[in-house]
């Protein structure tokens, strides 16, 4: 049962969870030194004063620390989760209530998120986060996105308003596409210039993840990008830490909580060997699994082979492996015909952003197959011959659906990147014409520096003659933008 109060601008599962959420937020703050240092550094300057930030990002305890950092820097914030299963309800309740409110008198941030949303509820929540009552355009002037759904809704709204019509729902390519078309049909009917007006004041978007960044580059290539974007995902302190070390932690956490199956001795297939795949493969090997990689990219395949992994095609191992994890950000990685060949009680899960890496629609259409819920976000699919597959989080992010996502320390890196990127776009609009940018190198290094003390790291300082010799400043940046780390 979700809590919605017509006097309050939020919708969460249960406000009575706020005290529990606040305790976990306090614990997380200690593990998020980057965000806390940024709060302290910018508290007086208030660089986000006047910013209206719409956030579409997993509503977790760690995200709560990000939200309260944005507020501490002067921003107003409205928030929705970017996944139907990823919200931690106690964190959402704590944000809605706020540090100075009570469940009877909430004084926090408008948040629209609960674990287990339907697709209709999910997109309604995104719409609410983008709708700012009593403002000039009725919308935000900044977006903080993860996966690009908030950005997508604005762009599709503007596109269809320009065309004068929304495509028929009969043209929808999926259930989610149908829901988006229904939402935009309603909003365009109610207010024919809603999205065009809303988009006019947006100074920019900062995008968290690979999938959303891919969308941004596509829109820029096609000439349809409406406002500048910072690609936070490809900041070194995001992709080389969150994607690798975060997944190394949270993949195993999700599988363990979901199944309680011993991983040691099992054969696990990791589809993709990018930063996420590398972290997943390392964690599975650390548990004693025999890990096999599938890859399309010869460079990543060579890396996997040099790291000691067998690299082959899914067809070669689909009937032999015990665990399958997709990490690619692409679609149709494991199809229904592949799952039909898997072993009894094979475990299938995804840690890429969307739910289209695993062909869940095709699986559901298999003649005679029966779906049964073991517990939330864990389902068995039983074939007519009695074979059972265990599918995690219905093909969505298993580390957030079956567990609580990445740990606080690694998210402090990513969310410090996000905060600094928001400050960049909001305070320097003249320096960022419409394009897709990466986080400036000096800010990337700053985020890393903010996390060293808590790990007991002591940096060596360049002498001036050494700095001159390699052509850098004593205080950095130390690497060229093309350096790969």
Swiss-Prot record:
EC number(s) from the headed UniProt entry: 3.13.2.1
List of residues binding NAD(+): 209-211, 243, 272-277, 295, 330, 351-353, 399
Keyword match Hydrolase: yes
GO cellular component, one term: cytosol
Residues the record lists as binding substrate: 60, 146, 208, 238, 242
Pfam families reported in the protein's UniProt record: AdoHcyase, AdoHcyase_NAD
NAD keyword on record: yes
Cofactor(s) this protein requires: NAD(+)
Pathway per the UniProt entry: Amino-acid biosynthesis; L-homocysteine biosynthesis; L-homocysteine from S-adenosyl-L-homocysteine: step 1/1
InterPro entries attached to this UniProt entry: Adenosylhomocyst_ase-like_sf, Adenosylhomocysteinase-like, Ado_hCys_hydrolase_NAD-bd, NAD(P)-bd_dom_sf, S-Ado-L-homoCys_hydrolase_CS
Function in brief: May play a key role in the regulation of the intracellular concentration of adenosylhomocysteine.
Name used for this protein in its record: Adenosylhomocysteinase
